[in-house]
Amino acid sequence: MPSLKDLRNRIASVKATQKITKAMQMVAAAKLRRAQEAAEAARPYSQRMGAVLANIAQNVTGEDAPALMAGTGKDDVHLLVVCTAERGLCGGFNSQIARLARDHARKLLAEGKTVKIITVGKKGADILRREFASLIIDHVNLREVKQLAFVHADQIGHKVIELFEQGEFDVCTLFYSEFKSVIAQIPTAQQIIPASAGDVAQAETAGDAIYEYEPDPAAILSTLIPRNISVQIFRALLENVAGEMGAKMSAMDNATRNAGDMINKLSITYNRQRQAQITKELIEIISGAEAL
């Protein structure tokens, strides 16, 4: 049984930890609001751009279609761009994204496909490296980035397009976590090269408007598709930041509550043990007095 001194030290230690988790919860809450606003602001733009591109794509067929839209005509080599957080202490946020990417990679490998991986964020890279170290061809470090900007996504997009033009892969899938609420972040896989069938369906439901394009649709697609790839990556990164802050706020709130419960239990144990010690000392005093 621990001594009273040990119990006092443990209570003090847990209280210090509770202050840290409470502070981290408040910081995450402050960052969450800005991150959520940024993610929600990016959604309409990225969704509308995808719909416009899909609408234009309906007017471009055959040899006129850009390679980024038409693809290579093969399905042999897959590139997975896995976006996670640079830091932990956010519950299962990173592991859920990594698990989705891992399961997808396993499925492709079981089908005899070739898989290549680009990791964005340290935590996801650490998880995937345990099983797919030889498949990771590049890692993007955003740890020193204080304010996420479009240029960071654009650099990743250019890297992906460069690999595609070099014939390094046939299909590219983006993995991230879509922010729904503080307690709900949904791991998501989005095919960005070639354009997925979902984009075409989105265009078909966009309305019956008829557009005239200047210059020709093929030229517009050649310019907009590379930018759309960067836009989709930027949206994924913004969704991730919001999801990370939401998960961190929830995790630190749980940690703070658990610390409070532990302090209560330790305090009860301390008080009982102290009471027992006082009772024992009183009995010894009374026994000594009676002996006299």
Curated annotation (Swiss-Prot):
Keywords associated with the record: ATP synthesis, Cell inner membrane, Cell membrane, CF(1), Hydrogen ion transport, Ion transport, Membrane, Transport
Alphabetical list of SUPFAM superfamilies matching this protein: ATP synthase (F1-ATPase), gamma subunit
Residue ranges of the TM segments: none
InterPro entries: ATP_synth_F1_ATPase_gsu, ATP_synth_F1_gsu, ATP_synth_F1_gsu_CS
Membrane topology field: Peripheral membrane protein
Pfam families assigned to the protein according to its UniProt record, in alphabetical order: ATP-synt
Biological process according to GO: proton motive force-driven plasma membrane ATP synthesis
GO molecular function: ATP binding; proton-transporting ATP synthase activity, rotational mechanism
Listed GO CC annotations: plasma membrane; proton-transporting ATP synthase complex
Primary location group: membrane
Localization (cell): Cell inner membrane
Assembly, per entry: F-type ATPases have 2 components, CF(1) - the catalytic core - and CF(0) - the membrane proton channel. CF(1) has five subunits: alpha(3), beta(3), gamma(1), delta(1), epsilon(1). CF(0) has three main subunits: a, b and c.
Job of this protein: Produces ATP from ADP in the presence of a proton gradient across the membrane. The gamma chain is believed to be important in regulating ATPase activity and the flow of protons through the CF(0) complex.
Family designation: Belongs to the ATPase gamma chain family.
Protein's UniProt name: ATP synthase gamma chain
